Amino acid sequence: ELRFTKGIEFNFSESATKKIAPGQKLLIVANEAAFNLRYGHPSTPQFVAGTFFKNLSDSGERIKLSFGAGTPVIDFNYDDDSPWPVAADGDGHSLVLIAPETNPDPNLANNWRISSQTKGNPGNSDVIHFEGNPNSDDNQNGLSNLVEYALTGKIIGNVITVQNQPYPSISYIRKLGSDDVYVSIETSQDLRKWNNSDSNYTILKEEYLGDGLIKITLRGINPIHENNLISFFRILITQR
């Protein structure tokens, strides 16, 4: 017997669908009639298993999917504060687990993103898979195919002031759904040796721009001091 025991209440023994294929999606909804009206379905689609009870908290909580006497299948906590995708908090986007086929840890905020459009993609996927040679520059604009798959626009470095302290900041525009890659921050003192600096930056702001684009602004966790060594940064795009 498979059922949700934390967050919402739903027992899959009562599901309209008794089995699904690998990679197939199954939905449980709060109200079938309202779901069909919102998404333009004349009748309830086959991928809707049924309706759940209780509502998820807008401020985050624990979700647990259990088997049998309570053996956890999935057990995690989500939140609505950074570093979790804050654009999913009241702006109409759903939270999307990135590359679920790789079995990512759902407790980690960086394994989630917002849907590329408001209202989400129930029953479907908004993932854009990469095709082609990652190192080629098919349109001859000086950027590799892999970079253009993940990002658009300019990458901007800046200095911002927080409580009278200067901090480094980095802004870039990410294409939502480009889940075949990781986006990382690297820094260097000499432009020869580069180090991963993801842990040295925190998300300051996420701004949905429409058309499946999101502007992400990161801020260094440490202020800039006069005796700091000059630091350079770059964004590294790598395939999963």
Question: Where would I find each of the regions flagged by the language model?
Answer:
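Short, composition-biased motifs enriched in small/polar/acidic residues
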Residues: 121-240
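Activation on beta-sandwich/Ig-like modules and their edge loops
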Residues: 1-110, 114-129
